[in-house]
């Protein structure tokens, strides 16, 4: 909690400072870059993937920039019907866009080693022709201004090996997804601003919506296998954190740019979808504990790896703490969770708050928990434009309270699910 509060506070300070300092105008790019938009896909809905690709390429075609952009759809799809749909969508895309738009599509018969090997194969076969690659997920969408800005930044900073944008969630339709989207847009920015400030040039990579210097990545970001607890060699599942650490170890800057607007991704529609994704992430993040001792990693890169793993280990730790508390309190005189007794089976016996200090501690804990949300909400309410986008102060406040309520409701479910995910990862 303290890290989140500190990061959000730094983000608030950074936000106010930026508003008071006039932004400098960048000169034209130092070098024109050939940029590949690389989209790895696996059994995805072709309409969504190719629809997003069409929107990005159409905007880039009319964008005022000297950079050149090409699209690579890298498919690991194993379902023959979806593969046929991808081929038809590719033909439609080819016929829709101007003739000089460079588009490639390739499908592997076997999805060996998943996404890291897709990128490695692309680098070995095509990477030499492109100074940079913009890695996108199947559900990623970026505006032309965001893409051009990232290419300009990479061009201006020859020491940068990777620049990560901060994707906003979009396309939410269910209550769960809308809650995630509201939280991301409203409360995510102070955390993103703060992360960009303290991470500086030792940032992280989230696997998509990031531009990477191809030569830098090819020279130092090859992934080894990591041994499991049982001693077997395993693929590194959450490869992005590790690749960022390897780039920084080789001397390349890994930057996080929270100020880039127009970077988007979708969010899981239901709690079940979220949990299934979280299980994969949990397994990958726990693998990072075996990579932390790697020689030469920057201290901040090690912190990113440890922090990702600890975020999942806290769930079983909290669950164990609750179980110990329940067992130790299992008695007539010491029971801390029983609100009924034999003499008064229908009337609850509420815990006695011994003094003012207990209330202060309770308020402090909840204040720390809610501080990032409160910081984001205050800034949103202070802006007339933001209030108007949310439908006014009353509607924003109602959404804010609903988000807090649903977060509290989902918290014990996610604690149990993450505990199960940790146990399955052992």
Regions found by a protein language model. Give the residues of each.
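Alpha-helical membrane-embedded segments
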Residues: 1-14, 367-370
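Internal catalytic domains of large membrane-associated glycosyltransferases
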Residues: 6-10, 16-296
């Amino acid at each position: 909690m303290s890290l989140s509060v500190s990061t959000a506070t730094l983000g608030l300070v950074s936000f106010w400072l930026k508003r008071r300092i006039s932004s400098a105008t960048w000169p034209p790019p130092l070098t024109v870059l050939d940029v590949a938009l690389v989209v790895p896909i696996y059994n995805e809905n072709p309409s969504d993937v190719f629809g997003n690709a069409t929107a990005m390429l159409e905007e880039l075609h009319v964008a005022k920039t000297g950079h050149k952009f090409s699209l690579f759809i890298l498919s690991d799809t194993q379902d023959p019907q979806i593969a046929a749909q991808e081929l038809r969508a590719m033909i439609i895309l080819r016929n829709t866009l101007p003739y000089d738009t460079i588009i490639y599509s390739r499908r592997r018969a076997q999805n060996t080693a998943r996404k890291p090997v897709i990128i490695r194969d692309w680098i070995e076969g095509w990477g030499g022709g492109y100074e940079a690659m913009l890695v996108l997920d199947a559900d990623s969408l970026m505006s032309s201004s965001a893409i051009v800005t990232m290419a300009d930044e990479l061009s201006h900073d020859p020491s940068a090996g990777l620049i990560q944008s901060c994707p906003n969630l979009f396309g939410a339709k269910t209550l769960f997804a809308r809650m995630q989207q509201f939280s991301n847009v409203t409360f995510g920015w102070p955390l993103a601003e703060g992360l960009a400030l303290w991470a500086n040039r030792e940032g992280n990579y989230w696997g998509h919506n990031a531009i990477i210097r191809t030569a830098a990545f090819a020279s130092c970001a090859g992934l080894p296998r990591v041994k499991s607890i049982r001693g077997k060699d395993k693929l590194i599942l959450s490869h992005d954190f590790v690749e960022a650490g390897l780039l920084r170890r080789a001397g390349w800057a890994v930057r996080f740019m929270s100020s880039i607007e127009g970077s988007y991704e979708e969010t899981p529609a239901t709690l079940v979808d979220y949990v299934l994704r979280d299980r994969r992430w949990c397994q990958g993040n726990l693998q990072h504990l075996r990579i932390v001792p790697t020689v030469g990693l920057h201290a901040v890169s090690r912190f990113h790896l440890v922090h990702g793993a600890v975020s999942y280990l806290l769930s079983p730790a909290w669950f164990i703490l609750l179980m110990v508390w329940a067992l130790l309190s299992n008695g007539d005189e010491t029971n801390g969770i029983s609100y009924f007794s034999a003499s008064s089976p229908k009337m609850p016996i509420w815990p006695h708050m011994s003094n003012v200090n207990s209330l202060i501690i309770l308020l402090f804990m909840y204040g720390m928990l809610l501080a990032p949300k409160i910081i984001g909400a205050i800034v949103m309410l202070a802006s007339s434009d933001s209030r108007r986008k949310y439908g006014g102060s009353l509607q924003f406040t109602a959404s804010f309270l609903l988000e807090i309520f649903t977060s509290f409701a989902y918290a014990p479910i996610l604690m149990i699910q993450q505990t199960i995910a940790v146990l399955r990862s052992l």
